Swiss-Prot record:
Its EC number is 3.2.1.21. The active site is at D225. It comes from Aspergillus flavus (strain ATCC 200026 / FGSC A1120 / IAM 13836 / NRRL 3357 / JCM 12722 / SRRC 167). It catalyses: Hydrolysis of terminal, non-reducing beta-D-glucosyl residues with release of beta-D-glucose. The keyword Hydrolase applies. The keyword Secreted applies. Residues 395-555 form the PA14 domain. Gene3D superfamilies: Galactose-binding domain-like, Glycoside hydrolase family 3 C-terminal domain, Glycoside hydrolase, family 3, N-terminal domain, Immunoglobulins. Beta-glucosidases are one of a number of cellulolytic enzymes involved in the degradation of cellulosic biomass. Catalyzes the last step releasing glucose from the inhibitory cellobiose. This is Probable beta-glucosidase I. It holds the Pfam family Glyco_hydro_3.
Amino acid sequence: MPRLDVEKTIEELSLGEKVALTAGIDFWHTASVPRLNIPTLRMSDGPNGVRGTRFFNGVPAACFPCATALGATWDTELLHEIGQLMGEESIAKGSHIILGPTINTQRSPLGGRGFESFAEDGVLSGLLAGYISKGIQEKGVAATLKHFVCNDQEHQRMAVDSIVTQRALREIYLLPFQLAMRICRTACVMTAYNKVNGTHVSQNKEIITDILRKEWGWDGLVMSDWFGTYSTSDAINAGLDLEMPGKTRWRGTALAHAVSSNEVAEFVMDERVRNVLNLVNFVDGLNIPENAPEKALNRPQDQALLRRAAAESVVLMKNEEDILPLKKEKSILVIGPNSKVAAYCGGGSASLDAYYTVNPFEGVSAQSKGEVKFSQGVYSHKDLPLLGPLLKTADGKTGFSFKVYNEHPSESNRELIEQLHLVSSSGFLMDYVNPKIKSLTYYVDMEGLFTPEEDGVYDFGVTVVGTGQLFIDGELVVDNTKNQRQGSAFFGSATVEEKGSKELKAGQTYKVLFQFGTAPTSDLDTRGVVVFGPGGFRFGASRRVGQEELISNAVKLASEAEQVVVFAGLTSEWETEGYDRDHMDLPPGSDEMISRVLDVNPNAVVVIQSGTPVTMPWANKTKALLHAWFGGNECGNGIADVLYGDVNPSGKLPITFPVRLQDNPSYVNFRSERGRVLYGEDVYVGYRYYEKVDLAPLFPFGHGLSYTTFTRSDLTLTTTPEKPQYEESGEPITATVTVTNTGKVAGAEIVQLWVAPPATEVNRPVRELKGFTKVFLQPGEQKKVEIVVEKKLATSWFDEMREKWASEKGEYGVLVTGTGEGVLKSSFKVEKTRYWLGL
């Protein structure tokens, strides 16, 4: 299709066509105007993989490590490669636009989507986001920076007003977007759900137009988050180009009326349309046909990149007495709830059906040359494990039948609309469609056969956005149709899990029937959350086992084992969009299990998987500790590569791990109170706070050990002569450092450059990260590395009185750190105070 002549096309569009172009037509597509050769564009989540157009029963995709995992790599080249693969995955899914990366800021360890953002520091987050976006857009696919801005909690996210000073807004929350834009002018930006200082961002002219467009000179498309548009005229006039998803709530006839009554000027309408048409031209080279089929790639080279990313993200937190790496020839006992669970991604928009997954037990087993034993230790599921994979159909397939009807189960002569075969007993129906379905109200019968392997009492659980009843051999075991209570699943729109139990016999086959009614059949009060169309369902089961029995068995085996590794942590049940965690603790029983295992085997290695910090009351007991995040498809292999030394760990923490939740600077100001949240810590987010008040965290930002040792030496600074005002170059400062691998194995060092300000007009952090680089070295190898920072970015704070950045005169300290304790120091001067605005 030929590129559009944008100005000529705008002249030829009718008002109705212009209005249509400013809103989606469904969950994932924009409007088309065939007579003018304007195609529909497809977009897809998301932050750690390209799901495609279907949450429900979709085409599998590559799942990358979560953003905090990628943040832990501190590797811009790796992020660039990952972006390129994401672009190729997007093309395979027929998608022109990727809804990511996410670059919000982890004010608190509890944020439900904290795992979706790279770091608590704007420089690290912004640079990584810029390089992953660059990789995406080099493939012709549009990247989307989100959520612009201050969408840093899930509690009342659509209604909460984030009250933040202009200084903190600029220095902390807008900074990652600003720095990412300097590397890659992303084609799209997605607004946040929340208000900032009294106005929803999607209709906040100061943020969208004055800062993003005018000050930063960005000219791409601004879209809303899903259902995150709250007005007609205000949003259009503020600069919101595209309301998502369709069908529109705020555009349509209301927008046409606003234009005809001069509430929205026609030239403003044309600006919104111009940005849509420019996006069409941006992705024109993809040549993706409308309604393109979705395909899977899953190539060997992609699997290798995913494995490399998983391994590079692992952070070696402790390694006393060189417990690690483990010996492949020795036997090993694998313990813990995350051992046989592939915690490959968080929940919500980040979730997808991965091509395949490798859990930690599988990763260890594949590499060990000795005997591998397993002990559960504890279970850590928030809801009961999915029952679907344990069911069989009548013809012996794993899974169950999924039969759709318009009529309630009580009605006779129901007409079968569609029958599917599913394996997962968790389904989000927001994008399930069938032309025979008459409305959002319909019913599904799911049937399968369950043959337990052990006698005992089995617990069954049902979570729904809608209504659900679960029957075993015709007996109602779980009824989740009445007196429903709000839970956290499905973006916070679901009920809590309702449970029932039944005693079952090993080897006996039972018929399981789950009857589901869609969201309109529910009486649940869902004010303040988004209910996505027909809703969703989840049913699970587990044999009831006493926790003490499980822990005691693990402890006994650990006391006798040659090598022990404990896998614990969180999963997508605990960290998910739509819900903030209540605390930092591991799931019930995990801490006790780890502590008791360490009591009998102090050399046991502990591996924690989570996207954000957790408490570790046993940390002083352990000699060897890894943090492994949500590692994508290859999480198990990546962890095993590090455990056995095939990969030397090089990850560094992108977020601070406090000793306890109360130590976090946002502790007294997190979650919405009467519709607002006060960002009371101001610019003292993360390490800035801990260093300012001299409070030691459990593990600091930037921490991470290696199996080798490094030295850093010969720091030199090269500065640029000052001019009366800052020019576009920003007056580069080049720091040169010699890095030497003084150990016996190859490894990667991350060199971090910090700037410490002199006394200025305002209180400032003790030091701030301003640059970094990663270098790979063989044993004994030495390399010179350069880190280039701009003086104006390295020295400035935002002056609210002048409404400009202030680079104050004075002597600024330069600190260079990395693995180990050594710090190189130097300094440079700013001779004259200067003020500036811009990107």
